[in-house]
Amino acid sequence: MNIAHAVEQAGLRPTDIERIVVGIGPAPFTGLRAGIVAAKALAFATGAELVGQDALSPQTQLVDEYASDDACHLTLAINDARRRQLYFMLMDSARGSAMPRTLVGMDIDYPQSIVRRVDAAVELLRADRPNVRYVVDVVGHGASKYAMTWDSLAALGSVSDDTLLDKGAYGLERFASFATSDESLARPVPVEPLYLRRPDVSVPNPLKHVLNHAGADKTE
């Protein structure tokens, strides 16, 4: 995207920008870092406030759009992390608050392991409130890819590949509104990339010494 062209199309000047919202992941390394660096540079150049927002928490808003029954809908927000893994987070947004309650914190794991962890969290909720019917809605990139795995969830609701960031201007507005709500701004997060996966690069082991080898001597 040409940022200067987008600003011009909106009838604005760069100095009119007061706040910039940037996604901080979790996502793969290269694209995530490039986006954050661009946002930081633009904020520095314009003097705009810079706000970071993770990609998973706002997904509760998508579930709220079609959760019309009397069940307590929990959101399993996911994002494809490649290598048959998913970034994920389990949240409960049906508590009269704009900020969802985290039930399983943001992490990376294999789909089968995610199912076990989510089922364990739901069991704890049921033990505390046995008369409540809980439903887990799975939403985000990778949801349909692992649809057969989600079938083993004890309280499966809907499964959707939707994300707010796929919905054009409407989705971006919802994403930004979530990031700039009073509750979000009261708990600012560092504008740094969320990778979650451990780096592949490791420090190599030192070279082994050959037994009884004193090394080469320098000759004149």
Predicted regions and their residues:
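N-terminal beta-alpha supersecondary unit
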Residues: M1-P26
